[in-house]
């Protein structure tokens, strides 16, 4: 079966909004009898895309003609499509029929050796699908040699042509060198594509220049 994964090592509210819009299309127009999963290591983070989807659903079907929402699920009753959350707090992580997974901020996954109970549960839920889609949208974190580090290493090998994997699509937004962070402010757009339009540009500037600079620069 064709399995597709996207690693997007840059996240913002705009990325969450795009993921929610994509899920909304599936909720109303997707194949019936499927589950869509909003996953993260933390339940609060898993809620972000899920709540955005709920807000869009309310605006499109405010009278709940074919859709509904409770504390844990967003459903299309007519087509039997369910959008739910999955996190480390979820007790039962099996028995799903997932067609698409949105894994948000996977840098928080701190399990050793690149393992992730959440990601594995999602893949098990997609095992019966011919073309499941697993989207991993995250910023960089501080957990070394964990799930995200392993995925980024694999992504770079795919990008550089070391590994031939037609089912793995990676978009990595990062600086070319650490030195350019301090020496070329215009280069920040490489790792923060939205910075030229974002209201937090001043905050980024303050954070970077208030941090201790490497002694080698």
Cite the ranges covered by each PLM segment.
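Conserved Walker A/P-loop ATP-binding site and its immediately adjacent core
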Residues: 34-53
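Catalytic P-loop NTPase motifs of RecA-like helicase/translocase cores
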Residues: 13-14, 93, 109-110, 143-144
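Conserved H-loop
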Residues: 9, 41, 139
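Walker A/P-loop NTP-binding motif
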Residues: 19-31
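Non-catalytic, compositionally simple segments
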Residues: 115-217
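Walker B catalytic acidic pair
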Residues: 104-108
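Inter-Walker segment of RecA-like/P-loop motor cores
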Residues: 49-99
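Walker A/P-loop
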Residues: 2-22
């Amino acid at each position: 079966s064709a399995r597709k994964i996207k690693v997007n090592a840059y996240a913002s509210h705009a990325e969450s909004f795009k993921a929610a819009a994509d899920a909304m299309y599936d909720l109303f127009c997707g194949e019936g009898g499927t589950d869509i999963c909003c996953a993260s290591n933390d339940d609060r983070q898993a809620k972000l895309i899920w709540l955005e989807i709920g807000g869009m659903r309310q605006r499109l079907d405010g009278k709940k003609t074919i859709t509904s929402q409770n504390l844990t699920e967003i459903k299309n009753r007519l087509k039997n499509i369910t959008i739910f959350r999955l996190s480390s707090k979820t007790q039962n992580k099996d028995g799903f029929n997932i067609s698409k997974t949105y894994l948000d901020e996977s840098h928080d996954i701190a399990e050793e050796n690149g393992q992730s109970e959440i990601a594995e549960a999602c893949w098990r839920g997609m095992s019966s699908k011919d073309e499941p889609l697993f989207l991993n949208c995250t910023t960089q974190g501080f957990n070394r040699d964990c799930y995200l580090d392993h995925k980024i290493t694999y992504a770079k090998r795919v990008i550089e042509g070391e590994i031939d994997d037609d089912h793995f699509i990676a978009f990595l937004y990062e600086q070319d060198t650490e030195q350019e962070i301090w020496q070329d402010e215009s280069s920040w757009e490489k790792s923060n594509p939205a910075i030229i339009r974002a209201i937090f540009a001043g905050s980024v500037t303050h954070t970077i220049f208030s941090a201790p600079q490497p002694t080698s620069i």
